[in-house]
């Protein structure tokens, strides 16, 4: 079917496909740098084990080993993905050289991310940022909740440094910077004290957010998690803790939900409208959990589509929902992992924009539930793919799976030589 034919079919149900395409082009999605090197970073031994209850599996050849390689890989992904992009950085991706020699995480400065800023500015990209509270000798294994004052002070200073870096990135790039605070602090077995670590965690975040910043430019987030490897019994930053902290401090931070950080029977799609009933702004990490926070590559599955439906229906595209990707798969080609996930979130958003949401809402309000089911099911066989192809063409990126040929050539010419 041609795009014009698909356009007519959608017009028959009250949907303007041209308007949907134009709207989607303006929606920024933050591409996570850590897929490219399996979350290793550049500030400590790249062969160190991951800590914080997270794990990368696989050893597919071609992992980025230097900032230059990582940026080159990201450039390939950018050329294959439609829409507006940001780059999401972790503090462990600081770039050190003769002019700016290595410093520890509590001493990081904006200059250690100048090359990332230049990279983004040259491509018209925004940037988001994350303090890195894992895979470091100062994890004891706790960080911001540690009873050890020296440990806690180190990580508080790291968080304050990251506030300054986020402010720098936002000012230089002219776009708000979401700065996400997440730690893997917790215990493997039943703790004797659940409140003490949370009191310390709260005090630590309070001190981090006392660092001056413009809340219109820097959006500190508090992210929760249900459990991780080695912290099965208790997580300091639980869902209740993180959400309550954000609600209590809504003048200086926003909540962030990662759809892999909840019990497997919970769905973030249902939480989005609940939070937007109270918060003017929230943030999301979109991933694909399989039985736990496994961070598989995002597919065009039911929950991804439901998440994007709620973003669109709740007015999230008007600056109320900050969307970022967060997954890491080392068992497949990393360029493909990035590209598949990014394009799938875009597909899910486009599908939501091609839904006659006002008409469906009216059916629900009028309690015409039989017709609502019929109309919703009919949408599943609409010619969405033809509209998606037109969107890709209008963004000057490959249509269908044509992009994979570029990835295969890049693997032959570049990635295969990284040995």
Q: Model-found features: residue ranges?
A:
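Acidic/histidine-rich catalytic cores of soluble enzymes
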Residues: 188-303
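Short linear capping/connector segments at secondary-structure termini
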Residues: 184-186, 225, 327
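Active-site groove signature of glycoside hydrolases
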Residues: 166-192, 218-219
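Structured alpha-helical segments in the cores of large, soluble enzyme domains
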Residues: 71-79, 119-126, 159-175, 200-214, ...
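Short, amphipathic alpha-helical segments
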Residues: 110, 145-160, 195-202, 236
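Alpha/beta catalytic barrel-like cores
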Residues: 1-147, 154, 164, 175-177, ...
